[in-house]
Amino acid sequence: MIIVKRIAKGIAILVGVVLLAGVTFIASDWRFYKRLATFDRMNSMTDMAWYEPVVEVKPGTPPEISRATADTRTLSPELVDALEFYAKENGSMSLLVWHKGALQMEWYGEGFDQSSYMESASMHKSVVALLYGIAIDQGYIPSVDEPASTYLIEWKDDARSKITIRNMLQMAHGLARASGGFNPLGDNMKLGMGTDWGGIALKSLAEDPPNTVFAYSNLNSQLLGLILQRATGMPYAEFLQKNLWSKVGESSARVWLDRPGGLAKTSGSLFTPPRNWLRLGILHLNKGRVGDEQVVPEAWIEQVITPSPNNPNYGFQTWLGTEYRPKVDYGKGVAAHVPHSEPFEAQDVVYFDGANGQRVYVIASEELVIVRMGEGGLDFQTGAFRWDEPKLPNLVIRGLRQVANEGESLEPWTPSEGP
């Protein structure tokens, strides 16, 4: 009996030690483990309270967006109906169409309106590209061909010292992906939800020579945010607000941080209502201008939309429709692809691409910007997204051309109250 009691006491002590070790382990990075434990119970598109801490990026007073009148209306009632049907069928939360200087359509799903904040996912990358043009123009960075190691001094003495900022903007960095896959303790998960995004990203070593392989990577875009912060000497959100959002934003944005006072998530998670994404698309269409002010250098916009050597469908953190491929993939190490059942109707489609089908399409030749936000993401069985990439812009372009050719007179469009 004494032996049994001693064994029981020993087991109790062991269990206590294990529990204490577990509590200590979790407490050492409680914010990460809280995110990890609650992620599968939240809606990543709309549960803004889950993303904390955040920094508010205050807006300015940009020019009003004109709404189409009887004289400027270009969408037929049939096209509006088709677009609303498309939006509802694909789990959309918002769909905006701006054409020839006027907002032709502004649709929101049930429970959403023009003040609703939504997760932008990787569309944020295309905003980072704009900020690089501003930083170079203001002299914070000498040129796009500056070695990244000028700012990432951790790279000075190894093969990564050959990587330029251009390589990173074009996703031709040659870096290995974060390890661990979906292992909750792996670097990949910590890059997504951890509390030291910069530290995790800096661990990645060179795998290929720079400018040889296209490899779309959140890790790369996170490092671009770190470079921008170190080069300017400002927190990312401050530089964004001072140089872009105060010019283009009609309402505030929110930037997610890994921890209080930490690094901004620059591979995704710029939270703002859809109308601000429309304004960013219009800025692109107007070659960097907002009203009478040149906010982003025109020459930089041209560089952003120039096809890169390793992927003709990618410029600087921004996607291009310049070459037709039935399946557009994300490069080395990513199985997912987006189906393209046909070419784009226009040859100059530029678009911001975010997970779950967050899109801003900019088509200068048609004087057209389309914003779509909502659900409808990846089919994990096939590795394909659940809709054709060209379907939405082609639907709009064909409808606009039909109206133009037939010379129809249209009634002003009135926004619906949702599905």
Identify the meaning behind each predicted range.
Residues I2-F112, Q138-I141, I397-P419:
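N-terminal leader/targeting segments and the immediately adjacent pre-domain N-terminus
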Residues E89-S92, S116, A355-G357:
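Short, small/polar residue-rich loop motifs at catalytic or cofactor-binding pockets
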Residues S115, F182-G268:
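Catalytic-site signature segments of enzymes, centered on catalytic residues
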Residues Q138-A176, K203, T232-G268, T272:
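Active-site helix/loop module of the DD-peptidase/beta-lactamase fold
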Residues S251-R254, T306-V369:
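Active-site Gly/Thr loop motif
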Residues V371-V403:
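C-terminal/domain-terminus segments
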